[in-house]
């Protein structure tokens, strides 16, 4: 709704804002109205040594205002689409969207929870279109949790969009964080990050805690920018998959936390070591267990054989069930040294050298 403070507060030692656009009042002045956008921006772009560092302080930023401060009308959703088109036209890689819609000043314009299918609201359709250009669209899940609506707010229901819910400092889902699923049964939110007690810059230059998925979303967007930079040949959908697969609740996903809180170290390994149909193995060297990342939703049994330098099988197992990721403990009595891991999945055989420490 505005970026008041972003042009006056010394929150970044570098000049990272390269363009601005105002689709509400017109022109390029976005430093008016509300400071919400500045607080959102600070979670990514802040870089004051010894004070506060955001998740992507060296990224370049374009500030786009699409939200009216004092009203809630469908016009704002069209503003959002215009903003997304503008972002695409200037070559933006990632959109962070810290807003959501469900009800409006005129009740005749309201949506219902049955409309949360990603194909009904104009803003969700716009978000899908933006994602199909190759941009990574990251959006807040909404702050309707526990209320009469309780569910996601649009465009958080959009397919191919990374929807982010909120947790507190202990990893517990925030009461206000909007719940999934979508009406067609898709997992939303995709992931979560801290949006309860998240530290942000204020327009007076102070740093204080704030609540909202408006802040968990950019925290993930900034982290995703760094992740993508580490594997520039990946696609936006590859980045989303890496974040999901690496998350804390991948095997117990639900409508509150989605796939969970991403482990960026695992996500980076998955993204950088998972070309084509190859199965990734981590860590290497390994202490007592190995983690396997699959490039697709596997439904085929996987045969594992760990052989020593003499070709002797020291551990083996057949893994069954549908999964993208699994953990294997070869055995507690395996000596430190070099081994060859044979992975058989259907007609495909992969041999990887691993080191036990």
Regions found by a protein language model. Give the residues of each.
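Exposed aromatic-hydrophobic patches
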Residues: 325-331
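Substrate-binding/access-modulating region of protease and related hydrolase catalytic domains
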Residues: 47, 66-157, 170, 183-186, ...
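C-terminal subdomain of the subtilisin-like protease fold in secreted/lumenal serine endopeptidases
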Residues: 92-96, 229-284, 314
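Subtilisin-like serine protease catalytic core
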Residues: 1-21, 26-76, 90-93, 104-106, ...
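C-terminal tail/sorting-segment detector
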Residues: 332-357
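Short proline/glycine-enriched turn/loop motifs at strand-loop junctions of beta-rich domains
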Residues: 195, 296-301
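Hydrolase catalytic cores
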Residues: 41-44, 64-68, 151, 195-257
């Amino acid at each position: 709704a505005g970026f008041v403070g972003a042009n006056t507060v010394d929150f970044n030692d570098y000049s990272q804002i390269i363009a601005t656009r105002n689709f509400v009042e017109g022109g390029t002045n976005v430093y008016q109205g509300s400071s919400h956008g500045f607080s959102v921006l600070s979670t990514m772009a802040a870089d004051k040594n010894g004070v506060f560092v955001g998740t992507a302080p060296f990224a370049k930023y374009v500030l786009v205002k699409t939200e009216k401060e004092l009203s809630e009308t469908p016009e704002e959703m069209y503003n959002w689409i215009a903003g997304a088109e503008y972002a695409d036209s200037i070559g933006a890689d990632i959109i962070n969207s810290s807003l959501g819609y469900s009800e409006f000043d005129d009740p005749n314009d309201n949506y219902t929870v049955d409309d949360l299918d990603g194909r009904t609201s104009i803003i969700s359709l716009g978000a899908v279109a933006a994602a199909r250009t190759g941009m990574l669209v990251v959006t807040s899940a909404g702050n309707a949790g526990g209320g009469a609506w309780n569910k996601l707010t649009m465009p958080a229901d959009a397919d191919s969009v990374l929807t982010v819910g909120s947790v507190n400092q202990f990893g517990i889902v925030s009461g206000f964080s909007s719940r999934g699923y979508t009406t067609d049964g898709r997992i939303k939110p995709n992931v979560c990050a801290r949006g309860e007690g998240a530290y942000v810059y204020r327009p007076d230059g102070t740093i204080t805690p704030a609540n909202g998925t408006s802040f968990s979303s950019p925290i993930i967007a900034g982290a995703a920018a760094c992740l993508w930079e580490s594997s520039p040949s990946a696609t936006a959908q590859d980045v989303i998959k890496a974040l999901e697969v690496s998350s804390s609740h991948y095997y117990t996903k639900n409508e509150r936390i989605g796939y969970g809180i991403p482990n960026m170290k695992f996500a980076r390994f998955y993204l950088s070591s998972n070309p084509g149909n190859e199965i990734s193995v981590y860590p290497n060297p390994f202490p007592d267990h190995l983690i396997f990342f699959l490039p697709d939703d596997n439904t085929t049994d996987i045969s594992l054989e760990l052989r020593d330098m003499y070709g002797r099988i020291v551990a083996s197992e057949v893994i069954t069930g549908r999964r993208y990721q699994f953990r294997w403990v070869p055995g507690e009595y395996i000596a430190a040294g070099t081994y060859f891991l044979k992975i058989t999945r259907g007609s495909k055989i992969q041999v990887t050298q691993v080191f036990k420490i």
